Amino acid sequence: MCIDLIRFELQQAAQILNQFMSDDKNLDPVRQAAFLLVDAFKAGKKVISCGNGGSHCDAMHFAEELTGRYRENRPGYPAIAISDVSHISCVGNDFGYEHVFSRYVDSVGCEGDVLFALSTSGNSKNIIKAIQSARQKKMKVIILTGQMGGAMSNLADVKICVPHQGYADRIQEIHIKIIHILILLIEQKMDINNESLTFLKEEGHV
């Protein structure tokens, strides 16, 4: 019984992943997002990431593997996840939860920076407000979303969307894989002397 359930869950996850990667229209925005981030880093700019719930954890995961390490040793890249509990509780209490991300973007965002905004529905009000603040700051915006992209669908420079209408966890499972691929692509473009990346170049994957 348990084994059957485990197998079913893995099969369903694999099916949704296969559906996503079978259409180049889903994959090309990942490439676009990586190039946009590389351009920002090379220009001395930073990325600010944000999300709610599981997407909040993904936003933190994205930032820590940029500032810290993914697979290879290399210089850290400037990334901040909006995850300071004191900031979130202060702004949530004094201004309302809808402002917890936008207030941070207003405070530290600069022209040319990138906002990496995650929402499985595309309708999170606090994420939309963060995007609006980023636009006012003349920042670039990448969204990582699901379903049909929601209300934020037309607010981004790059929209990466997992077009799945079911449970949010299935969307998030693909989101974390996209995040890892983004970091790999960034490393390829930022660190061309890395031996493993040189191998990828020789194999025609870069």
Curated annotation (Swiss-Prot):
Subunit structure, interactors included: Homotetramer.
Binding site for Zn(2+): 61, 65, 172, 180
Annotated PROSITE patterns: SIS
EC number(s) per entry: 5.3.1.28
NCBIfam families: gmhA, PRK00414.1
One GO molecular-function entry: zinc ion binding
Species for this entry: Hamiltonella defensa subsp. Acyrthosiphon pisum (strain 5AT)
GO cellular component: cytoplasm
Family: Belongs to the SIS family. GmhA subfamily.
Catalytic activity: 2 D-sedoheptulose 7-phosphate = D-glycero-alpha-D-manno-heptose 7-phosphate + D-glycero-beta-D-manno-heptose 7-phosphate
Protein name: Phosphoheptose isomerase
Segments forming domain SIS: 37-195
